[in-house]
A protein has these predicted regions:
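Active-site bordering "gate/hinge" segments
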Residues: 1-222
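Metal/cofactor-centered catalytic core regions of large enzymes
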Residues: 34-35, 46, 130, 134-362
Length: 362
Protein backbone atom coordinates (compact mmCIF):
# COMPACT_ATOMS: atom_id res chain seq x y z
CA UNK A 1 0.00 0.00 0.00
CA UNK A 2 1.22 3.48 -0.86
CA UNK A 3 2.21 5.07 2.48
CA UNK A 4 0.36 8.22 1.46
CA UNK A 5 -2.91 6.28 1.70
CA UNK A 6 -2.23 5.51 5.35
CA UNK A 7 -1.34 9.17 5.93
CA UNK A 8 -4.61 10.16 4.24
CA UNK A 9 -6.55 7.79 6.49
CA UNK A 10 -4.78 9.09 9.59
CA UNK A 11 -5.63 12.68 8.68
CA UNK A 12 -9.29 11.73 8.19
CA UNK A 13 -9.47 9.81 11.45
CA UNK A 14 -7.53 12.23 13.65
CA UNK A 15 -7.81 15.72 12.19
CA UNK A 16 -11.07 15.62 10.24
CA UNK A 17 -13.40 13.46 12.34
CA UNK A 18 -11.68 12.59 15.63
CA UNK A 19 -12.55 8.90 15.59
CA UNK A 20 -12.36 7.48 19.12
CA UNK A 21 -13.30 4.44 21.17
CA UNK A 22 -16.98 3.57 21.00
CA UNK A 23 -17.69 5.49 17.80
CA UNK A 24 -19.79 3.89 15.09
CA UNK A 25 -18.19 4.82 11.77
CA UNK A 26 -19.71 4.54 8.30
CA UNK A 27 -17.04 4.29 5.60
CA UNK A 28 -18.59 4.83 2.16
CA UNK A 29 -16.08 4.46 -0.66
CA UNK A 30 -16.01 3.37 -4.31
CA UNK A 31 -14.39 0.03 -5.20
CA UNK A 32 -11.20 1.74 -6.39
CA UNK A 33 -10.60 3.10 -2.89
CA UNK A 34 -10.37 -0.27 -1.15
CA UNK A 35 -6.88 0.50 0.18
CA UNK A 36 -8.20 3.61 1.91
CA UNK A 37 -11.02 1.51 3.39
CA UNK A 38 -8.47 -1.00 4.70
CA UNK A 39 -6.40 1.75 6.32
CA UNK A 40 -9.47 3.32 7.93
CA UNK A 41 -10.66 -0.03 9.26
CA UNK A 42 -7.24 -0.65 10.82
CA UNK A 43 -7.46 2.69 12.59
CA UNK A 44 -10.99 1.93 13.81
CA UNK A 45 -9.77 -1.39 15.19
CA UNK A 46 -6.80 0.22 16.92
CA UNK A 47 -9.02 2.87 18.54
CA UNK A 48 -11.94 0.66 19.54
CA UNK A 49 -14.40 2.14 17.03
CA UNK A 50 -16.94 0.07 15.09
CA UNK A 51 -16.80 0.51 11.28
CA UNK A 52 -19.51 -0.27 8.73
CA UNK A 53 -18.36 -0.40 5.12
CA UNK A 54 -20.63 0.77 2.29
CA UNK A 55 -19.47 0.37 -1.30
CA UNK A 56 -20.74 3.10 -3.62
CA UNK A 57 -21.17 2.32 -7.31
CA UNK A 58 -21.97 5.05 -9.82
CA UNK A 59 -23.26 2.41 -12.24
CA UNK A 60 -25.65 1.00 -9.66
CA UNK A 61 -26.81 4.49 -8.69
CA UNK A 62 -27.54 5.29 -12.34
CA UNK A 63 -29.36 2.00 -12.88
CA UNK A 64 -31.65 2.57 -9.92
CA UNK A 65 -32.53 6.14 -10.84
CA UNK A 66 -33.31 5.21 -14.45
CA UNK A 67 -35.43 2.20 -13.48
CA UNK A 68 -37.50 3.65 -10.63
CA UNK A 69 -40.85 5.31 -11.28
CA UNK A 70 -40.74 7.28 -8.03
CA UNK A 71 -38.64 7.63 -4.89
CA UNK A 72 -39.39 7.42 -1.19
CA UNK A 73 -37.29 8.26 1.83
CA UNK A 74 -34.97 5.28 2.49
CA UNK A 75 -36.01 4.54 6.06
CA UNK A 76 -33.39 1.81 6.46
CA UNK A 77 -30.63 4.25 5.56
CA UNK A 78 -32.00 6.82 7.98
CA UNK A 79 -32.00 4.21 10.75
CA UNK A 80 -28.33 3.50 10.06
CA UNK A 81 -27.47 7.19 9.99
CA UNK A 82 -29.24 7.84 13.29
CA UNK A 83 -27.01 5.25 14.95
CA UNK A 84 -23.80 6.58 13.35
CA UNK A 85 -21.29 8.94 14.97
CA UNK A 86 -18.87 9.48 12.06
CA UNK A 87 -19.21 9.39 8.28
CA UNK A 88 -16.26 9.11 5.90
CA UNK A 89 -17.18 9.47 2.23
CA UNK A 90 -14.68 9.41 -0.63
CA UNK A 91 -15.21 10.16 -4.28
CA UNK A 92 -13.28 8.21 -6.87
CA UNK A 93 -15.45 6.73 -9.57
CA UNK A 94 -14.12 5.15 -12.73
CA UNK A 95 -16.35 7.22 -15.03
CA UNK A 96 -17.15 10.78 -13.99
CA UNK A 97 -19.90 11.01 -16.64
CA UNK A 98 -21.68 7.80 -15.56
CA UNK A 99 -24.89 9.61 -14.63
CA UNK A 100 -25.04 11.85 -17.68
CA UNK A 101 -28.18 10.20 -19.08
CA UNK A 102 -30.27 10.49 -15.92
CA UNK A 103 -32.96 13.11 -16.48
CA UNK A 104 -32.69 16.32 -14.42
CA UNK A 105 -36.21 15.86 -13.05
CA UNK A 106 -35.26 12.35 -11.90
CA UNK A 107 -32.26 13.66 -9.97
CA UNK A 108 -34.46 16.36 -8.45
CA UNK A 109 -37.07 13.83 -7.32
CA UNK A 110 -34.41 11.56 -5.84
CA UNK A 111 -32.79 14.44 -3.96
CA UNK A 112 -36.13 15.50 -2.50
CA UNK A 113 -36.71 11.95 -1.27
CA UNK A 114 -33.36 11.73 0.55
CA UNK A 115 -33.22 15.32 1.83
CA UNK A 116 -34.08 14.47 5.45
CA UNK A 117 -31.65 11.55 5.46
CA UNK A 118 -28.89 13.82 4.17
CA UNK A 119 -29.62 16.34 6.93
CA UNK A 120 -29.22 13.53 9.47
CA UNK A 121 -25.76 12.79 8.09
CA UNK A 122 -24.76 16.45 8.13
CA UNK A 123 -25.68 16.66 11.82
CA UNK A 124 -22.90 14.19 12.68
CA UNK A 125 -19.11 14.30 12.38
CA UNK A 126 -18.34 13.77 8.71
CA UNK A 127 -15.62 14.09 6.10
CA UNK A 128 -15.91 14.18 2.32
CA UNK A 129 -12.64 13.48 0.56
CA UNK A 130 -11.18 12.28 -2.74
CA UNK A 131 -9.43 9.08 -3.74
CA UNK A 132 -7.31 9.58 -6.88
CA UNK A 133 -8.47 7.47 -9.84
CA UNK A 134 -7.65 7.43 -13.57
CA UNK A 135 -11.13 8.77 -14.37
CA UNK A 136 -10.66 11.90 -12.30
CA UNK A 137 -7.09 12.28 -13.56
CA UNK A 138 -8.36 12.19 -17.13
CA UNK A 139 -10.97 14.84 -16.39
CA UNK A 140 -8.26 17.04 -14.87
CA UNK A 141 -6.02 16.56 -17.92
CA UNK A 142 -3.32 14.87 -15.84
CA UNK A 143 -1.53 11.55 -15.77
CA UNK A 144 -2.67 9.15 -13.07
CA UNK A 145 0.65 9.53 -11.24
CA UNK A 146 0.55 13.32 -11.37
CA UNK A 147 -3.05 13.33 -10.14
CA UNK A 148 -2.16 11.06 -7.23
CA UNK A 149 0.57 13.53 -6.25
CA UNK A 150 -1.89 16.42 -6.60
CA UNK A 151 -4.53 14.81 -4.38
CA UNK A 152 -2.25 13.53 -1.65
CA UNK A 153 -0.28 16.78 -1.53
CA UNK A 154 -3.55 18.73 -1.21
CA UNK A 155 -4.88 16.71 1.72
CA UNK A 156 -1.62 16.73 3.70
CA UNK A 157 -0.76 20.42 4.07
CA UNK A 158 -0.20 22.05 7.47
CA UNK A 159 -3.83 22.70 8.43
CA UNK A 160 -2.92 24.73 11.51
CA UNK A 161 -0.96 27.21 9.38
CA UNK A 162 -3.69 27.27 6.74
CA UNK A 163 -6.31 27.90 9.40
CA UNK A 164 -4.37 30.83 10.85
CA UNK A 165 -4.16 32.41 7.38
CA UNK A 166 -7.89 32.01 6.83
CA UNK A 167 -8.74 33.29 10.31
CA UNK A 168 -7.78 36.78 9.14
CA UNK A 169 -10.72 36.76 6.73
CA UNK A 170 -13.03 35.21 9.31
CA UNK A 171 -12.28 38.16 11.60
CA UNK A 172 -13.23 40.60 8.84
CA UNK A 173 -16.50 38.83 8.06
CA UNK A 174 -17.63 38.05 11.59
CA UNK A 175 -19.09 41.47 12.35
CA UNK A 176 -19.80 42.47 8.75
CA UNK A 177 -23.13 43.60 7.39
CA UNK A 178 -22.75 43.43 3.61
CA UNK A 179 -20.57 41.78 0.96
CA UNK A 180 -20.29 42.91 -2.64
CA UNK A 181 -18.65 40.79 -5.36
CA UNK A 182 -17.57 42.50 -8.60
CA UNK A 183 -15.76 40.83 -11.49
CA UNK A 184 -15.45 42.05 -15.05
CA UNK A 185 -18.55 43.41 -16.76
CA UNK A 186 -20.94 40.61 -15.82
CA UNK A 187 -20.71 40.16 -12.06
CA UNK A 188 -21.97 42.70 -9.56
CA UNK A 189 -23.70 41.00 -6.65
CA UNK A 190 -24.56 42.34 -3.21
CA UNK A 191 -25.76 40.38 -0.19
CA UNK A 192 -26.23 40.85 3.53
CA UNK A 193 -24.46 38.50 5.92
CA UNK A 194 -25.59 40.40 9.03
CA UNK A 195 -26.00 38.10 12.00
CA UNK A 196 -24.51 35.10 10.22
CA UNK A 197 -21.28 33.27 11.02
CA UNK A 198 -18.15 32.84 8.90
CA UNK A 199 -16.70 29.32 9.14
CA UNK A 200 -12.99 28.51 8.83
CA UNK A 201 -12.66 25.34 6.71
CA UNK A 202 -9.42 23.64 7.71
CA UNK A 203 -9.83 20.17 6.24
CA UNK A 204 -12.46 18.70 8.52
CA UNK A 205 -15.83 18.26 6.78
CA UNK A 206 -14.04 18.67 3.45
CA UNK A 207 -10.56 17.23 2.89
CA UNK A 208 -8.89 19.15 1.36
CA UNK A 209 -10.20 22.28 3.00
CA UNK A 210 -9.14 25.82 2.35
CA UNK A 211 -12.04 28.25 2.27
CA UNK A 212 -13.96 30.65 4.45
CA UNK A 213 -17.70 30.31 4.00
CA UNK A 214 -20.90 31.81 5.31
CA UNK A 215 -24.54 32.17 4.30
CA UNK A 216 -26.26 35.20 2.80
CA UNK A 217 -29.38 36.50 4.49
CA UNK A 218 -31.95 34.68 2.37
CA UNK A 219 -33.84 37.55 0.72
CA UNK A 220 -30.90 39.97 0.56
CA UNK A 221 -29.05 38.83 -2.57
CA UNK A 222 -29.34 41.30 -5.44
CA UNK A 223 -27.61 41.72 -8.79
CA UNK A 224 -26.00 39.54 -11.42
CA UNK A 225 -23.24 36.95 -11.44
CA UNK A 226 -21.35 35.16 -14.20
CA UNK A 227 -19.77 31.91 -13.06
CA UNK A 228 -16.90 31.79 -15.51
CA UNK A 229 -15.46 28.42 -14.46
CA UNK A 230 -17.38 25.25 -15.40
CA UNK A 231 -18.65 22.55 -13.08
CA UNK A 232 -19.60 18.90 -13.38
CA UNK A 233 -22.97 17.93 -11.95
CA UNK A 234 -24.74 14.62 -12.42
CA UNK A 235 -22.11 13.53 -14.93
CA UNK A 236 -22.45 16.56 -17.20
CA UNK A 237 -20.56 19.81 -17.61
CA UNK A 238 -22.41 23.06 -17.01
CA UNK A 239 -20.55 26.08 -18.34
CA UNK A 240 -21.06 29.82 -18.58
CA UNK A 241 -23.76 30.10 -15.91
CA UNK A 242 -25.38 33.52 -15.50
CA UNK A 243 -27.85 34.26 -12.74
CA UNK A 244 -29.87 37.36 -11.88
CA UNK A 245 -31.14 37.77 -8.31
CA UNK A 246 -33.92 39.96 -6.98
CA UNK A 247 -34.91 39.86 -3.30
CA UNK A 248 -32.65 36.84 -2.89
CA UNK A 249 -34.30 34.73 -5.57
CA UNK A 250 -32.98 33.70 -9.01
CA UNK A 251 -35.35 35.44 -11.41
CA UNK A 252 -33.52 34.61 -14.64
CA UNK A 253 -30.77 32.22 -15.63
CA UNK A 254 -28.74 31.09 -18.62
CA UNK A 255 -25.83 28.78 -19.40
CA UNK A 256 -23.64 28.31 -22.44
CA UNK A 257 -23.73 24.54 -22.01
CA UNK A 258 -26.40 22.23 -20.54
CA UNK A 259 -28.80 25.01 -19.61
CA UNK A 260 -31.61 22.46 -19.24
CA UNK A 261 -29.65 20.77 -16.45
CA UNK A 262 -29.23 24.12 -14.71
CA UNK A 263 -32.97 24.70 -15.09
CA UNK A 264 -33.69 21.33 -13.49
CA UNK A 265 -31.47 22.18 -10.54
CA UNK A 266 -33.17 25.54 -10.00
CA UNK A 267 -36.62 23.95 -10.22
CA UNK A 268 -35.90 21.25 -7.63
CA UNK A 269 -37.79 23.11 -4.91
CA UNK A 270 -38.38 26.63 -3.63
CA UNK A 271 -35.04 26.80 -1.82
CA UNK A 272 -33.00 25.89 -4.89
CA UNK A 273 -33.54 29.38 -6.33
CA UNK A 274 -31.88 31.03 -3.32
CA UNK A 275 -28.22 31.16 -2.33
CA UNK A 276 -27.29 28.96 0.61
CA UNK A 277 -23.56 29.67 0.67
CA UNK A 278 -20.92 32.26 -0.12
CA UNK A 279 -17.44 30.75 -0.06
CA UNK A 280 -14.06 32.37 -0.63
CA UNK A 281 -11.21 30.10 -1.75
CA UNK A 282 -7.92 30.57 0.13
CA UNK A 283 -5.88 27.41 -0.45
CA UNK A 284 -2.84 28.53 -2.46
CA UNK A 285 -1.58 24.93 -2.56
CA UNK A 286 -4.39 24.05 -4.98
CA UNK A 287 -3.01 25.83 -8.00
CA UNK A 288 -4.89 24.31 -10.93
CA UNK A 289 -8.46 23.74 -12.05
CA UNK A 290 -9.42 20.04 -12.17
CA UNK A 291 -13.20 19.95 -12.78
CA UNK A 292 -13.62 18.67 -9.23
CA UNK A 293 -15.52 21.05 -6.98
CA UNK A 294 -14.01 19.59 -3.82
CA UNK A 295 -10.68 21.08 -4.96
CA UNK A 296 -11.71 23.86 -7.34
CA UNK A 297 -13.80 25.81 -4.82
CA UNK A 298 -10.81 25.96 -2.46
CA UNK A 299 -8.42 27.56 -4.99
CA UNK A 300 -7.07 30.97 -4.14
CA UNK A 301 -8.32 33.77 -6.41
CA UNK A 302 -11.85 32.32 -6.50
CA UNK A 303 -15.25 32.91 -5.00
CA UNK A 304 -17.99 30.30 -5.09
CA UNK A 305 -21.67 30.45 -4.34
CA UNK A 306 -24.12 27.61 -3.91
CA UNK A 307 -27.76 27.65 -4.87
CA UNK A 308 -29.76 25.54 -2.46
CA UNK A 309 -29.33 24.51 1.14
CA UNK A 310 -27.41 26.55 3.69
CA UNK A 311 -25.23 25.03 6.39
CA UNK A 312 -27.17 25.70 9.63
CA UNK A 313 -23.98 26.50 11.56
CA UNK A 314 -23.47 29.57 9.33
CA UNK A 315 -26.93 31.06 9.94
CA UNK A 316 -27.62 33.28 12.94
CA UNK A 317 -30.57 32.73 15.27
CA UNK A 318 -32.51 35.67 13.86
CA UNK A 319 -32.12 34.60 10.22
CA UNK A 320 -33.86 31.87 8.25
CA UNK A 321 -31.92 28.79 7.12
CA UNK A 322 -32.44 28.23 3.41
CA UNK A 323 -33.58 24.63 2.99
CA UNK A 324 -33.37 22.68 -0.24
CA UNK A 325 -32.67 19.20 -1.55
CA UNK A 326 -29.93 20.78 -3.69
CA UNK A 327 -26.60 22.41 -2.92
CA UNK A 328 -24.74 23.27 -6.12
CA UNK A 329 -21.50 25.26 -5.95
CA UNK A 330 -20.41 27.48 -8.84
CA UNK A 331 -17.19 29.47 -9.16
CA UNK A 332 -16.16 33.00 -10.17
CA UNK A 333 -12.50 33.55 -11.14
CA UNK A 334 -11.39 36.60 -9.13
CA UNK A 335 -7.80 36.79 -10.40
CA UNK A 336 -8.34 39.78 -12.73
CA UNK A 337 -10.53 42.90 -12.75
CA UNK A 338 -12.25 41.74 -9.57
CA UNK A 339 -12.88 42.97 -6.04
CA UNK A 340 -14.53 41.76 -2.86
CA UNK A 341 -15.94 44.58 -0.74
CA UNK A 342 -17.04 44.18 2.86
CA UNK A 343 -19.11 47.04 4.23
CA UNK A 344 -17.79 49.24 1.45
CA UNK A 345 -14.11 48.46 2.03
CA UNK A 346 -12.08 46.46 -0.50
CA UNK A 347 -10.73 43.33 1.21
CA UNK A 348 -9.54 41.54 -1.93
CA UNK A 349 -8.43 42.90 -5.29
CA UNK A 350 -7.56 40.62 -8.21
CA UNK A 351 -7.20 37.66 -5.86
CA UNK A 352 -4.92 39.35 -3.29
CA UNK A 353 -6.30 39.95 0.21
CA UNK A 354 -5.82 43.11 2.22
CA UNK A 355 -3.64 41.16 4.69
CA UNK A 356 -1.33 39.77 1.97
CA UNK A 357 1.79 41.29 0.47
CA UNK A 358 1.09 42.96 -2.85
CA UNK A 359 -2.42 44.15 -2.02
CA UNK A 360 -3.37 47.37 -3.80
CA UNK A 361 -6.17 49.38 -2.25
CA UNK A 362 -7.04 51.09 -5.54
Amino acid sequence: MDPRIREHAETIATHSTGIEAGDTVVVQLPPAAEDLAVALHEICGDRGAQPVFLSYSQRADRAYKRAADSFEEPAHRRALYEETDVFVIARGGANVTEGADVAPETNAAYNRAIEAVKRERLSKRWCLTQYPTPGHAQLAGMSTEAYEDFVWDAVSIDWETQGAFQAQLVEILDDAEEVRIRSGDETDLTMSIAGNTAENDTGEANLPGGEVFTAPVRESVSGVVHFDLPLYRYGREIDGVRLRFEDGRVVSHAADRNEELLTGILETDEGSRYLGELGIGMNRAIDRFTYNMLFDEKMGDTVHMAVGSAYPETVGETNAVNESAEHVDMIVDMSEDSVIEVDGEVVQRDGTFVFEDGFEAA
